[in-house]
Amino acid sequence: MGRSRSRSSSRSKHTKSSKHNKKRSRSRSRSRDKERVRKRSKSRESKRNRRRESRSRSRSTNAAASRRERERASSPPDRIDIFGRTVSKRSSLDEKQKREEEEKKAEFERQRKIRQQEIEEKLIEEETARRVEELVAKRVEEELEKRKDEIEREVLRRVEEAKRIMEKQLLEELERQRQAELAAQKAREEEERAKREELERILEENNRKIAEAQAKLAEEQLRIVEEQRKIHEERMKLEQERQRQQKEEQKIILGKGKSRPKLSFSLKTQD
């Protein structure tokens, strides 16, 4: 019992440490992604600010130039101060330049305040987004931790389902291969049977032709034997006839037998 408990505790510690390492790596990757997003947003914001500043400068410069033109067109050549003295054009130009510089300073300060406010708003927005993202990540981790067993069961179920599907597909593939092999074997057997039948037919035809040739040869041999017998009989008959004639001739020559003719002699008288 003690050994099993120690083994289970070591397994659980190893599992917890591996899960902790996985969580730490996920949090590090998320922090790196956040830092990259923050840097990109800052660079985009700085570009927007520079464009805004350039537009505002050009706008203020154009406005100052237009004001100077209007003042030149509307201002009289000389002015009189409160004491009735004529004010020279030089002093009026100095006042205009001073007023324009003050307006430029005021515009620059206003633009600076606007930029400062935009930067502060952007920082607040980024901090809010960061906190929201951290809160969402924390909630997601908590939810994943709560649903860990359910997720593991779902993963195991999907793995088992995929395994069953793969086993089924493998069995179907093996069955298709077996059927294909059976069909190929059947086709080979059918082809061999057809070849065997063709060979048997050819052999039968050859045997029939050989039998016919042998029968014709036997008939021809019988005919030759019969002709030879007839010739022999004819020879025998001729030989017997020749012998008979020879005997007859011998009998005639030797005078044997009744068949010898009588000789008659007669004398004729002369008148």
Swiss-Prot record:
Induction data: Post-transcriptionally regulated by autoregulatory feedback loop. ARGLU1 protein binds ARGLU1 pre-mRNA and stimulates alternative splicing to produce two alternative RNA molecules. The first includes an additional exon between exons 2 and 3 and is rapidly degraded by nonsense mediated decay. The second, a stable intronic sequence RNA (sisRNA), retains the entirety of intron 2 and is able to bind ARGLU1 protein preventing it from stimulating alternative splicing.
Disordered: annotated span: 1-112, 236-271
UniProt KW Nucleus keyword: yes
GO cellular component, one term: nuclear speck
Necessary and sufficient for transcriptional regulation, as annotated region: 73-271
Modified residues (Phosphothreonine): T61
Motif interval(s): LXXLL motif 1: 170-174
Sequence motif: LXXLL motif 2, positions: 199-203
Modified residues (Phosphoserine): S58, S60, S74, S75, S264
One Pfam family in the UniProt entry: ARGLU
Expressed in which tissues: High expression levels in the neocortex, hippocampus and thalamus but low expression levels in the midbrain and hindbrain (at protein level). Ubiquitously expressed with highest expression levels in the central nervous system and low expression in uterus and pancreas.
Keywords: Chromosome, mRNA processing, mRNA splicing, Nucleus, Phosphoprotein, RNA-binding
GO MF annotation: an example: transcription coactivator activity
Region annotated Necessary and sufficient for RNA binding, chain positions: 1-72
Predominant subcellular localization, coarse grouping: nucleus
Places the protein is found: Nucleus; Nucleus speckle; Chromosome
Biased composition (Basic and acidic residues): 66-82, 91-112, 236-251
Amino acid composition bias (Basic residues), ranges on this chain: 1-29, 37-58
Subunit text: Interacts with MED1; the interaction is direct. Interacts with PUF60, U2AF2 and JMJD6; may interact with other proteins involved in RNA processing and splicing.
Family: Belongs to the ARGLU1 family.
Domain notes from UniProt: The N-terminal region can bind RNA; preferentially binds 5'-CGG[AG]GG-3' motifs.
Function (record text): Dual function regulator of gene expression; regulator of transcription and modulator of alternative splicing. General coactivator of nuclear receptor-induced gene expression, including genes activated by the glucocorticoid receptor NR3C1. Binds to a subset of pre-mRNAs and to components of the spliceosome machinery to directly modulate basal alternative splicing; involved in simple and complex cassette exon splicing events.
Protein name: Arginine and glutamate-rich protein 1
Taxonomic lineage from the root: Eukaryota, Metazoa, Chordata, Craniata, Vertebrata
